């Protein structure tokens, strides 16, 4: 239908975020259809969250294509976004020393010891995309003034040689909603990461919370014949 025509234009980037979509009258004239058919096309786009109508202002594109990342090797968020042609940024960065929850302490074999906790909100093309909550052992000597620096954490502690990751779809907590400025009913892709150094010692535990409407992961596997 006509709705699919406009949907493809939006998904292919012919119509970008902020662009005005043809009015019902314009659609009628261009495609020689009834007012009801033209209205239905716009309604379909609106129901799928691709456009938004402003009273007396017209209909504008709100859809942003998902960032698709292939899970094949270890790289930082900055490297991921740069490779995809996006501009990475940091909305907020806070580092503290605190006693983590019991599950995190058990993961690192700690009792009541403190760890570094780093909370970051990262952006892609100035759009809020992911909220990171990371824990690191104090033995890594991460500077507490790192939030004033531009270097990545891996530049300080060294890149991991192995990571274990687990993905799940969750409903966001209040903390995640505030960080990403999303509603409680917006799905989030949760990514749990445990990183190891070359001595197979755990050096990082991170929970990543990605906006489900803007991010997806592709996993490719192959079999040797």
What does each model-found stretch correspond to?
Residues 60-73:
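Short, cationic-aromatic polyanion-contact patches
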Residues 14-19, 47-56, 62:
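Beta-hairpin "wing" of winged helix-turn-helix
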Residues 75, 87-225:
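C-terminal all-alpha effector/ligand-binding and dimerization domain
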């Amino acid at each position: 239908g006509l709705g699919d025509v406009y949907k493809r234009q939006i998904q292919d980037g012919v119509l970008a975020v902020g662009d005005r979509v043809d009015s019902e009258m314009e659609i009628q004239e261009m495609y020689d259809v009834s007012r009801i058919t033209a209205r239905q096309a716009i309604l379909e786009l609106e129901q799928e969250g691709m456009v938004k109508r402003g009273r007396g202002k017209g209909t504008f594109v709100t859809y942003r294509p998902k960032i698709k990342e292939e899970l094949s090797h270890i790289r930082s968020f900055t490297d991921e976004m740069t490779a995809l042609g996006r501009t990475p940024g940091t909305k907020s960065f806070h580092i503290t020393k605190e006693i983590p929850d019991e599950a995190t302490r058990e993961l690192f074999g700690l009792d009541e010891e403190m760890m570094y906790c780093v909370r970051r909100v990262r952006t892609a093309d100035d759009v809020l995309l992911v909220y990171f909550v990371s824990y690191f052992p104090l033995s890594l000597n991460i500077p507490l003034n790192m939030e004033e620096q531009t270097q990545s954490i891996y530049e300080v502690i060294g890149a991991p040689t192995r990571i274990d990751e687990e993905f799940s779809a969750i409903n966001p907590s209040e903390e995640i909603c505030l960080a990403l400025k999303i509603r409680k009913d917006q799905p989030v892709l949760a990514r749990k990461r445990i990183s190891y150094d070359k001595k197979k010692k755990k050096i990082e535990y991170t929970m990543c919370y990605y906006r489900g409407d803007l991010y997806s992961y592709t996993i490719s596997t192959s079999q040797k014949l």
